[in-house]
Amino acid sequence: MAEITGLVLPFFGLIFLGYLTARLVDHPGEAMGWLNTFIVYLALPALFFKLVSRTPVEELTRADFILTSVGTTYVVFALIFAIGLFLRRNTVAEATMQGFAGAYGNIGYMGPGLALLALGETAAVPVALIFCFENAAHFTVAPAMMAAAGGSKQKPAVVALGIARRIAFHPFILSTFAGVAAAFLSFEPPLPLQRLIDYLAQAAAPCALFAMGVTLALRPLKRIPAEIGYIVPAKLVLHPVLMYLALSLGGAYDPIWVQTAVLLASLPTATNVFVIGQQYGVWQERASATILITTLLSVATVTGLLYLIRSGALPADLFP
């Protein structure tokens, strides 16, 4: 257990330092803009490119793994959406936000750093594949559902064009595809460029985690919404359990790939859920509360999951 604590403490410690710094130092929220720009447009794309470009091409074309992992995430989304819409009688827009809160994990800011730290560089490819295709799905579903709910005043063709543009030009997706192309062509960047990529990649995890802590501090918890009662268990427990079962039933996967997918599924609600709510003017305060609560509780749940993985108590294939 001491080994697991040694893995998790620096990771969540960076989030805590970001939170503490934001509470102690009086800076406006806009001051985070350039740090987030550095993370989203430079550091994390460099990390994805570096890791994917060094991977054998055959490992980058596992459509079965992609469909199973993304499909499992949307099973959780559909379940929470149905609870919100039919049992709680919320609007389509509110139920959509609840679905994202229960299924959209913080795989961008938390995923790469934690997976690589806990499972090694072999985890890089499943992290990149899950992140790339899951975010492409989120970028498609969110505006489509909000348009169906009447939360968007744009014409369907404009919505569709916006979705395609957002997916095609997202820096994470572009860097992943660039990494795939480099792997296919066996391209190695010149040494000065490779060093620059390395510097940016090394900055990705600490900057992203610190920024996440600051973001949590800037959105203080005002009240605990009732939906927390089913969203939190769905995100922190149901999602990783279903991911584990689906991959165990779905085929023969590398144990590290299974463990990576389960670990990513166990992560707390993504800060992008608040951004979506803010964009459409729905469920903003509750999204902020959900992100904060799931992040706090994930210290225990993620630590427990890592203990199961590292101790061998969680076999890679439940049905060998």
From Swiss-Prot:
InterPro entries: Mem_transp_PIN-like, Na+/solute_symporter_sf. Gene3D superfamilies: 1.20.1530.20. The chain crosses the membrane at residues 1-21, 32-52, 65-85, 113-133, 167-187, 196-216, 256-276, 289-309. GO terms for cellular component: plasma membrane. Its main location: membrane. It is a multi-pass membrane protein. It is found in: Cell membrane. The keyword Transport applies. Pfam families: Mem_trans. Keywords: Cell membrane, Membrane, Transmembrane, Transmembrane helix, Transport. The keyword Ribosomal protein does not apply. GO terms for biological process: transmembrane transport. Belongs to the auxin efflux carrier (TC 2.A.69) family. This is Putative malonate transporter. The gene is mdcF.
